[in-house]
Each structure stands twice: as C-alpha cells, then as structure tokens.
Regions:
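Extracytoplasmic loops and strand-loop junctions of Gram-negative outer membrane beta-barrel proteins
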Residues: 1, 39-44, 95-103, 149-154
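Gram-negative outer-membrane beta-barrel transporters
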Residues: 1-81
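Hydrophobic alpha-helical segments, principally membrane-spanning helices and signal/leader peptides
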Residues: 7, 51, 97-99, 121
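Generic detector of short, locally flexible boundary/turn motifs and exposed helical patches
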Residues: 25, 34-39, 94-100, 133-135
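C-terminal beta-signal and adjacent terminal beta-strands/loops
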Residues: 67, 75-94, 108-114, 118-173
C-alpha cells in the first residue's frame, strides 16, 4: 500500500430558511460539489469514492398546540461513484481482481423521507423533549454498493437501511 494520491474538493451550498407562518417553517438546501482524486502521479483525476455532486435537502416543521410539533426531511443525493467490473478472477493474496476490465460508473441517486413527531414540556425546572423519528418512511431500497461474485460474472446491489423507527428523549437543565 502506498499513500501517494492527490485529492481536490470544491463546491458551494445555497440555503434558504423561511418561516411561512408563526407555526410553519422550513428550509431548502442545495449543495454542488466535486471530490476528485489522482491515485498516481500523471494519471487523470477521477471521482473519489464518496463524490456526490448534488445534494438537495428539504425540511418542513409545523408547530401544534401544547408543545407538539411534526416535521419531515426529504433528501435527494447523487449516487456514489463505483467501478463496474467485467470479467476477471478475485486474487486472495492482494484482495484485487486479475484481468478485470473496469469502467467508471455511478450508483443510482439516493432519496429518503424521514418524519418526526415530538412533544416538549417542562418538568421540575427541566426542559424535556420526547420524540418519535421514522427514518426512510417509504422504505426505499437505496443502493449502497455493488457486490460481485468471485469471477465478476454476477453481481447484486447492496441496499441501505430499511424503515427505522426510534424513540428518544432530550433533557435540558
């Protein structure tokens, strides 16, 4: 293993936050960025493993009576770069593929909707927030990686997280 690569990261973010009424607010965030790597001197730059040029996040929160509020977050993100392999055999000695022809590709875009309901109240001079989060509400099977067979003739897509509900409490004193 030789750590001889050079990397470049550049980009920008736009954020708009707005309270539409006293009870309803939200924001929209858009990030445009690139993350490139040159693995060896003289080679062309290529997307780094976690290069995600486009990230869109939309958040909305509605305040209900008696300390309740509901909110949601939607994210749409460019898929991560991946190498699409064709033909070859896995070499156990170095963990690589022999005679593999790889081309640069990108996984499909990631999108997810998360919802949250929470209640805030005061208890003995302490601010208590109890919440229910549901991550990936519509259970989209976001592709995280491509897993290949030993000879690269077959592959499967490894999906990300399913629906995950969670309960929590935050205390401020």
């Amino acid at each position: 293993f030789a750590n001889q690569g050079i990397g470049q990261i550049f980009g920008g973010e736009f954020l708009l936050r707005k309270a539409l009424t006293k009870k309803f607010f939200g924001w929209v965030s858009y990030t445009l960025m690139r993350s490139l790597v040159q693995e060896k001197p003289g080679e062309a730059y290529k997307p780094f493993a976690f290069d995600q040029p486009h990230i869109l996040t939309v958040i909305a929160v509605y305040k209900l009576p008696r300390g309740w509020q509901v909110g949601g977050r939607f994210r749409l993100v460019s898929g991560n770069p991946t190498t699409l392999y064709k033909d070859g055999v896995f070499n156990n000695e170095d963990g690589g593929y022999l005679n593999a022809r790889g081309t640069q590709g990108r996984l499909p875009a990631f999108h997810q909707l998360d919802l949250r309901v929470d209640k805030t109240f005061t208890y003995k001079r302490m601010l208590v927030n109890v919440y229910l989060d549901v991550i990936n509400v519509y259970n989209h099977q976001n592709p995280e990686a491509i897993v290949y067979s030993y000879n690269l003739q077959q592959n499967t897509v490894q999906a990300g997280l399913p629906i995950i509900p969670s309960l929590g409490t935050r205390l401020e004193f």
